[in-house]
Amino acid sequence: MDGIHDLGGRAGLGPIKPESDEPVFHSDWERSVLTMFPAMALAGAFNLDQFRGAMEQIPPHDYLTSQYYEHWMHAMIHHGIEAGIFDSDELDRRTQYYMDHPDDTTPTRQDPQLVETISQLITHGADYRRPTDTEAAFAVGDKVIVRSDASPNTHTRRAGYVRGRVGEVVATHGAYVFPDTNALGAGESPEHLYTVRFSATELWGEPAAPNVVNHIDVFEPYLLPA
């Protein structure tokens, strides 16, 4: 969906101020949130694209003024309630309890196999390549244009700044889980994925350096012949 998360090419948001020597985690709660993500995914609360879609529904002001792992928390709360893992009243009760009793320890459960699975997911990620009998519509060297119509009301990887732009296919990667359907829980619907080369001037106009290119991975349904 279109929203404040899609910031590529947008101006007027002020300077970017990177934090020097930024730590991996700013607080211990961020460590917990990181491990909660694969644990809840393995419990069936969401898939990766549903998770991203929930973050994209955060109101713009809240999105820009909250921390990275707060976005994750929002998505996990949203899907945890939808999946019936907990309800909002239970979450409020537990939150209030630990606000009133900050020195109390949280319950623990030992599951070495789950810990190992989560460790592997965090370290190596998951493979989203899928087999398909469908032939690729495009080949290396083809000129393509990214569809310029508005984003559907779901998570998509078709960034705003690339819509309507013409590029050249420089690599084909086979089929991968299609985010737009996967985010709706409507199936993985594997689609061919391509790397498309765009000139910087095609993407950004005359201010861009004429000898610079951008390589962007684009799913087949986002593309039309140029």
UniProtKB/Swiss-Prot annotation:
Annotated region (Disordered), positions in chain: 1-22
Use of this protein: Industrial production of acrylamide is now being developed using some of these enzymes.
Keyword Transferase among UniProt keywords = no
Name under which the protein is recorded: Low-molecular weight cobalt-containing nitrile hydratase subunit beta
Pfam families cross-referenced by the UniProt entry: NHase_beta_C (PF02211), NHase_beta_N (PF21006)
Q: Does the keyword Transferase apply?
A: no
Q: Which organism is it from?
A: Rhodococcus rhodochrous
Primary enzyme class: lyase
Report which reactions are catalysed by this protein. Answer: an aliphatic primary amide = an aliphatic nitrile + H2O
The domain of life for this entry's organism is Bacteria
Give the family from UniProt: Belongs to the nitrile hydratase subunit beta family.
Signals that turn on the gene: By cobalt and urea or cyclohexanecarboxamide.
Assembly and oligomerization: Heterodimer of an alpha and a beta chain.
Query: What GO molecular-function term can you cite, just one?
Result: transition metal ion binding
